[in-house]
């Protein structure tokens, strides 16, 4: 498609650790760039309603941990599924904005607490990254976008082993302000 990933790293991932990968979510290419960037096995946590999209949904529900954000029981199931993946040595990826904003002018929407709560409860480091160009290269608007660079910034890793659940908002704000 003519995209050239350029990665700048402030941190390196350790092979023997699981991580909570987070990034801004502005484009359909975010998932592919996350897979390209991390080089570690991981599973996405995503919205259950996306599993209803024809064809895409077939693969989506077989490869992701699905959450129904309106169902407390679903959130508990996500907690258990995430723990199972961490026990298998996998990492988890969540886009903390909870989806792509409908407003094309929003560059970074508010973060939801879920990724940070899960990371703290499981004592898993948070590995934030920023996708600078994805919205410009391949936005959700039809007939727009262009080939070119897709810059990724891998930020410092936030350790969670001393944090309590009450610290989730502070962790959320620190990562969002990167």
Give the location of each predicted region:
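Catalytic core of membrane glycerolipid acyltransferases/transacylases, capturing the structured
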Residues: 2, 15-72
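Short acidic-hydrophobic, aromatic-tinged amphipathic segments that line or gate anion-handling sites
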Residues: 8, 65-68, 160
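Short gly/ser/thr-rich secondary-structure transition/capping motifs
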Residues: 1-8, 75-76, 134-137
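Short, charged, surface-exposed secondary-structure boundary motifs
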Residues: 53-57, 76-78, 154
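Non-catalytic C-terminal accessory region of glycerolipid acyltransferases
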Residues: 78-178
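A short beta-turn/loop motif at secondary-structure boundaries
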Residues: 10-15, 144-145
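Residue-level detector of flexible, active-site-proximal loop/helix-junction positions
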Residues: 12, 51, 71, 133, ...
